[in-house]
């Protein structure tokens, strides 16, 4: 049975993604029955960061800065022929 081909394809794509605005895949661990993807550690996800910063919604410059970084990450993915169908702040 092994690892599904979709998982292998996603892992190979994630290994190629090297950009400041994309969380990096650090390692892949394959045990007997499970496959573990080890990603770069981040203190907070975007949603928690936005919720913990009341000034976020009040400062248009801050919103633009975050949006710019998100769009740079998406543009990088698109330039490598990768589409992300599940973007969310978590």
From Swiss-Prot:
- The UniProt entry annotates the active site at 86
In terms of SUPFAM superfamilies, this protein maps to:
Protein kinase-like (PK-like)
Establish whether keyword Metal-binding is in the entry: no
* Recorded family membership: Belongs to the protein kinase superfamily. CMGC Ser/Thr protein kinase family. CDC2/CDKX subfamily.
* Enzyme Commission number, as recorded: 2.7.11.22, 2.7.11.23
Which biological processes are named by the entry's GO terms? cell division; G1/S transition of mitotic cell cycle; regulation of G2/M transition of mitotic cell cycle; regulation of meiotic cell cycle; signal transduction
According to the record, the protein's activity is controlled as follows:
Phosphorylation inactivates the enzyme.
Q: What is a single molecular function from GO for this protein?
A: cyclin binding
Give the tissue specificity. Differentially expressed in leaves, protoplasts.
Q: Return the GO cellular component terms, semicolon-separated.
A: cyclin-dependent protein kinase holoenzyme complex; cytoplasm; nucleus
Q: Which InterPro entries match?
A: CDK, Kinase-like_dom_sf, Prot_kinase_dom
Its ancestry begins with:
Eukaryota, Viridiplantae, Streptophyta, Embryophyta, Tracheophyta
Q: State the source organism's domain of life.
A: Eukaryota
Q: Which PROSITE patterns match?
A: PROTEIN_KINASE_DOM
Its protein name is: Cell division control protein 2 homolog
As its record notes, the protein acts as a catalyst of:
L-seryl-[protein] + ATP = O-phospho-L-seryl-[protein] + ADP + H(+); L-threonyl-[protein] + ATP = O-phospho-L-threonyl-[protein] + ADP + H(+); [DNA-directed RNA polymerase] + ATP = phospho-[DNA-directed RNA polymerase] + ADP + H(+)
